[in-house]
Amino acid sequence: MVARTPQKQRKVAMVVPPLNSDLLKETINKVDKCMERLQELQYTIAGGTKVVSGVNLSPRSTRIYLKTSLRCKQETLRIKNATNKKSPVGKFPASSPGDWRKMSLPAMLLGETVNEILQASQVTRDIVDAIAPKKSRKSRRLTMSQEDDGPKTPETQQKSREQNPETVSSNIKARRKKEKQNRRSESDSPPSLQRARSRIAFRTISPQVKGNNGENSFRHLANRVSPKHKPWVKKAVLFPNPLFISGTATQQAKFSRTMSPVIARNEISSIKNNKETPYKFLIKSPPTSASKFQVKIRSPPKVLVSPTRNGSNSVRKSPRGSRSPTRTVNLGKKSASISPIRNTGKRSPKLSTAAKLRRSFTPTRNGSNLARKSSISPKRVTLQAFLSPTRNGNFCKKSPKASISPTRVCNKSQKLSTAAKFRRSFSPSRLAMRFVSPMKSRKV
């Protein structure tokens, strides 16, 4: 037998229109979401900073703004010309008909749309309440709470079948007793087996494989050896420190010539032991064929003559003993000449070039120059000057045969610089003596 519905219920079903209440509920939820978004838009247009779907909204950022502004102008003209000045029901109240003009156009449009959506949602809710079958009050409350808070999963009926807490606790106690009994039985067995169960079982390697690997280990590991496994290989250093390199002195000298802030080890030891002047301050001897204007200092002078003493010595000497700095006279097989200024064995402290230039213009210096140059001729050298050691101021107390070169006088003389010679040649005392000295030298 097929069960049939009673006639009363059949009539009611035929009268009710075919509307799906679930579909209407979904539409209401969608309308509510649209309302939230429109409220955000309204807040943004009114001057707020709300963001909708990650985009900052401003009234003039869209193309629709221009279209709606044009529509707003048309609407204002239509309202002015219309006879009926009352606003429609559901829009702005009649008491303030011109207030909306003060607002911006998008704000006005949004306000109208929000009101319309609210009305539509209310109508649909009324329809749903009328169409839905009458249920108990409890079910209505559940549906209302679901609509307010959103959809929820229905509660399962298994909660009614839950065991009492006393039975749950008794089950837990029974389980613990069983575990304790199992542990006691395991403790009777040897502990090594118990530990081995918890350990990791490593895979054993057969001895044949081990032997093969031992024979050809270098071949297999050739491409995979890291530098820490090769201690015999020197590490590559990008910027080596020459202090820790055991190389020759020339290699380390090359390093020090560069501008690196590293001091060579051998150079430090050599400077400490020898205490010699470094190569930068070595004074090289001039070449043998050096011209007059290419004068180089050969070595730091150790013997200098003070001007006053030099002048007194030159006064005592005979005018016949003339000395020229350019000519030499052969005495037997050896050449002998005397440099013009440095002709005494007495020593004086070392003088700088600036001090020499200052002294050349002092009055005492000029006087000594007059006295000295009266007895010196630049052209001839007599034999008496070389044969009489007493007149020459006892040059190192040596025999007259000792050769005296213009560059060396007992290895304690020093050449004048070219600049000093030129300055001295233009002094008034020197010019005066230029006229006198040739006559004296001719008399000899």
Swiss-Prot record:
Listed Polar residues bias regions: 205-216, 307-329
GO molecular function, one term: microtubule binding
Keywords of the record: Cytoplasm, Cytoskeleton, Nucleus
One of the GO biological process terms: phragmoplast assembly
Membrane spanning residue stretches: none
Its job: Is required for spatial control cell division during plant development. Through an association with microtubules, acts both for the positioning of cytoskeletal arrays that establish planes of cell division during prophase and for spatial guidance of expanding phragmoplasts toward preestablished cortical division sites (CDS) during cytokinesis.
Subunit text: Interacts with POK1.
Name of the protein: Probable microtubule-binding protein TANGLED
